[in-house]
Amino acid sequence: MTTTLQQRSTANVWDRFCEWITSTENRIYIGWFGVLMIPTLVSAIACFVIAFIAAPPVDIDGIREPVAGSLLYGNNIISGAVVPSSNAIGLHFYPIWEAASLDEWLYNGGPYQLVIFHFLIGVACYLGREWELSYRLGMRPWICVAFSAPVAAATAVFLIYPIGQGSFSDGMPLGISGTFNFMIVFQAEHNILMHPFHMLGVAGVFGGSLFSAMHGSLVTSSLVRETTETESQNYGYKFGQEEETYNIVAAHGYFGRLIFQYASFNNSRSLHFFLAAWPVIGIWFTALGVSTMAFNLNGFNFNQSIIDSQGRVIGTWADVINRANLGMEVMHERNAHNFPLDLAAGDVAPVALTAPPING
């Protein structure tokens, strides 16, 4: 009689699971960060879609005046949003089990917290997953460093700013018009357009767009001819080919003569590092600016800075912006305040520039 011994396969289930999770041969890399990223992002997306379509109105200001944000309550794609949780909740963690009923949870904007917390964990894990895959493949880690800019921006508007202001009702709504409302109120309360870190962010985003267009057009204009006039130039490139597909010397010569010699990169590596670093650093600064303005360290105030010899104010664009800020502030949350804080606490401000008397 022959006796055979068979090793139990269950002893290696964990090892095979680990190998599958960390395998770079999968069509889509999962990784250990992906183990947390996938369920959190799926939860955030599912709750966002359901809330955007069907969530009942939310008492965002905590004054029993609900704001409707979902499609089924009369909104469209532009006006719809997942409305932030109620000011009555403040900074309290508000999961479903903390509410007395599902209706109460919906009325107080519980879905907003569910979405942003899962979303922030998910995008942080996506950043970690980028590093993890780079590590497995022996690549340098700069991809995740670049992605840290949008992660920092999202963290600033969804987490840091509400913490600084004392309530998640001050977080950015999850919708198009809600985002615009957030921007307008942010300008009214913090004068973000006059903050140097926001200016750096504008330079980063607009400059990055300009440099991207310049680089793409230069490369496309200096391709090595591999096709005839009747063929698409895209057929002149084969994936993985060793030869350069464009002439960097020609591109450098063109741009150096168009502007001046040292305005043009002669090193492809430093050029592409610059293209990545410029917008990333700009967005880092904007996220840092929002995080400081969260605690009311606001933009520059040049209101009524110029006066004549008689002490009369000579209006500047700073005064025009200040007047616009006051108008936006008095109009937002108009039923939540008896009197706007800036107007109640500050000096008397004229509502119009002094006009000269009319003789006639």
Swiss-Prot record:
Q: What domain of life does the native source organism fall in?
A: Bacteria
- Post-translational modification comment from the UniProt entry: Tyr-161 forms a radical intermediate that is referred to as redox-active TyrZ, YZ or Y-Z. C-terminally processed by CtpA; processing is essential to allow assembly of the oxygen-evolving complex and thus photosynthetic growth.
Protein name per Swiss-Prot or TrEMBL: Photosystem II protein D1
A Pfam family the protein falls into: Photo_RC
The record's function comment reads: Photosystem II (PSII) is a light-driven water:plastoquinone oxidoreductase that uses light energy to abstract electrons from H(2)O, generating O(2) and a proton gradient subsequently used for ATP formation. It consists of a core antenna complex that captures photons, and an electron transfer chain that converts photonic excitation into a charge separation. The D1/D2 (PsbA/PsbD) reaction center heterodimer binds P680, the primary electron donor of PSII as well as several subsequent electron acceptors.
Q: Which GO terms describe its molecular function?
A: chlorophyll binding; electron transporter, transferring electrons within the cyclic electron transport pathway of photosynthesis activity; iron ion binding; oxidoreductase activity, acting on diphenols and related substances as donors, oxygen as acceptor; oxygen evolving activity
Q: Which Gene3D superfamilies match?
A: Photosystem II protein D1-like (1.20.85.10)
Residues noted as binding Fe cation in the record, renumbered to the chain: H215, H272
Its source organism is: Trichormus azollae (Anabaena azollae)
One biological process term in Gene Ontology: photosynthetic electron transport in photosystem II
List the catalytic activities from the record: 2 a plastoquinone + 4 hnu + 2 H2O = 2 a plastoquinol + O2
